[in-house]
Amino acid sequence: MNINKIALIYNQNSKHLAIIEEIKKLYNYCKIEEAEAIIVIGGDGELLHNIHRYMNLNIPFYGVNLGSLGFLMNPLDTKNLLQNIHESTVSILNPLLMQAEDISGQIYTALAINEVSIFRKTNQAAKFRIDVNGIERMSELVADGALVATPAGSSAYNLSAGGPILPLDSNMLCLTPICSFRPRRWHGALLLSSATIKFEILNTNKRPVNATADFQEFNNITNVTVKSTKDKPIKLLFNKNHTLEDRIIKEQFGG
């Protein structure tokens, strides 16, 4: 990629400031608003927070992993950092758009890159109805919660909850229960990315439920609607020999 203006973002309280200082010496970085690419140093959480913060700028992000897992990041390679960016490949992620209503009638909207989840707020299991494209598909699910994951997010919380990993270009979404009690053997569904999923919370007084879109949490929710949106495409840059597609395939074989 022909990228000449690069911005740098990192956590000022990072325990890796010595490494970050070395990276800062490599290039004359510009302001974020002027950049053609944004380098984010840290882990997946740091990258997700900054994507949410700057996604409206429509600038590609290149993550450098100094965290733990770093699934959406590139490995640290200080010596070849700029060359790797120039030779990088682009993965386009379409986030989820969540609309949630709480018990007071307040409406919240949020975007999620990985997943939208709903989960019980107390020791009582959650109860909710599931509609897909306006058609009731499950009259009552009793569980700790449920989530809708994008292909990029399918290897995160979704995988831990027992959901499948989706290829990045699959145009599918995962609908996965979290510790389903009834129906006990239901393991979720694979839906087209064009689907609109609605969760209607049952018995909200006795069984309160919260909802999250990535790291954004909303309390005492009565219903949640989730759908994929192409209005806010997110561009992630990956080293040519370390693409996100390859990582998703590797994850399916325990890599």
UniProtKB/Swiss-Prot annotation:
Chief localisation class: cytoplasm
SUPFAM superfamilies found in the cross-reference section: NAD kinase/diacylglycerol kinase-like
Catalyzed reactions: NAD(+) + ATP = ADP + NADP(+) + H(+)
Any Gene Ontology biological process: NAD metabolic process
EC annotation from Swiss-Prot or TrEMBL: 2.7.1.23
Swiss-Prot/TrEMBL keywords: ATP-binding, Cytoplasm, Kinase, NAD, NADP, Nucleotide-binding, Transferase
GO CC, alphabetical: cytoplasm
Entry binding sites for NAD(+): D44, G45, H49, N114, E115, D144, A152, S155, A156, Y157, N158, L159, S160, Q216
InterPro entries: ATP-NAD_kinase_N, ATP-NAD_kinase_PpnK-typ_C, NAD/diacylglycerol_kinase_sf, NADK
Pfam families named among the record's database cross-references: NAD_kinase (PF01513), NAD_kinase_C (PF20143)
Gene3D superfamilies assigned to the protein according to its UniProt record, in alphabetical order: Probable inorganic polyphosphate/atp-NAD kinase, domain 1 (3.40.50.10330), Probable inorganic polyphosphate/atp-NAD kinase, domain 2 (2.60.200.30)
Active site, UniProt feature: D44
Needed cofactors: a divalent metal cation
TM stretches of this protein: none
Subcellular localization, as worded in the UniProt entry: Cytoplasm
GO MF annotation list: ATP binding; metal ion binding; NAD binding; NAD+ kinase activity
HAMAP family: NAD_kinase
Family to which this protein belongs: Belongs to the NAD kinase family.
Chain's role: Involved in the regulation of the intracellular balance of NAD and NADP, and is a key enzyme in the biosynthesis of NADP. Catalyzes specifically the phosphorylation on 2'-hydroxyl of the adenosine moiety of NAD to yield NADP.
NCBIfam families from the UniProt entry: PRK04761.1 (NF003406)
Name by which UniProt lists this protein: NAD kinase
Lineage, opening ranks: Bacteria, Pseudomonadati, Pseudomonadota, Alphaproteobacteria, Rickettsiales
